[in-house]
């Protein structure tokens, strides 16, 4: 699976670009501020309906325009899918797939499994559990069709339960919703647990390549005491939840724990090793996706030379190549990437002041 064409209009500093893409490694180079990262961001926006650089989508629309337009052609075997997205400054979004309107952004995410490795993505190990839950849920969403419905119901019921807690609703009226919450929470938790187990198996070999002699243990915590029945816990914690105005325990508190011996990886590994660990996690996800549903991820790797030394750049690029995925890599100087490749990239693009040129 790969993107064969990408059209960008009024996105960041790119007024207009029409790109024919390679199905393997695509190298995009240019000075800081040239617009090279905007190409990655446009691909991400097309797959997720949002930016990985800003929570305010209006910021990606060019200053003198009222909308941005993105279009891509996706090829998987003999199947061809055309995806179009238009975002207005008002916040309205129009999405079409093969000419038909798409109502849910999750349809985009399902169609384009995108993995991002940027300087900011290394916060996966430093921030709170939310980013690690999102990491788990990316894989659960793509590999188990029942996950999204159960996850959406957990979110909906938790929101309603928290509103009732803020309104000081008696537990007798909350009890029905707790039963529903427990039902969907158990589905979400089982899928997450199973996914992390499968991911761990794929991760071991990659970590051996990236971090030899480092034994990283990965475990999943579900968000409440595994020895306690969730229904019983919700009832027992009702007074505390009522006082706090929100639900303290549940699948919304799940986490992915990574340790070396008894220490969290943040305390046991150097910054460089942690960067490699995040890369290993992303590659393991891509390989597991291919194994379980025979679908490749699309990797967006921003500013690779500044994050890893030459040897580890070469190792990462080789691992990405081994996945069979389409990869987009940005750099200031092309030599920093070219020197790390065993085979030349499929396509090379130069970006300068928002103008994109193909380098033959």
UniProtKB/Swiss-Prot annotation:
GO terms assigned for molecular function: ATP binding; single-stranded DNA binding
Keywords recorded for this protein, A-Z: ATP-binding, Cytoplasm, DNA damage, DNA repair, DNA replication, DNA-binding, Nucleotide-binding, SOS response
InterPro entries (alphabetical): DNA-binding_RecF (IPR001238), DNA-binding_RecF_CS (IPR018078), P-loop_NTPase (IPR027417), RecF/RecN/SMC_N (IPR003395), RecF_2 (IPR042174)
UniProt signal peptide: none
GO aspect biological process, one term: SOS response
Any GO CC annotation of this UniProt entry: cytoplasm
Keyword rRNA processing included in the entry's annotation: no
Subcellular location, record wording: Cytoplasm
Protein residues bound to ATP: 30-37
NCBIfam families: recf
Reported function: The RecF protein is involved in DNA metabolism; it is required for DNA replication and normal SOS inducibility. RecF binds preferentially to single-stranded, linear DNA. It also seems to bind ATP.
Family: Belongs to the RecF family.
Entry protein name: DNA replication and repair protein RecF
Organism: Shewanella loihica (strain ATCC BAA-1088 / PV-4)
Name of the gene: recF
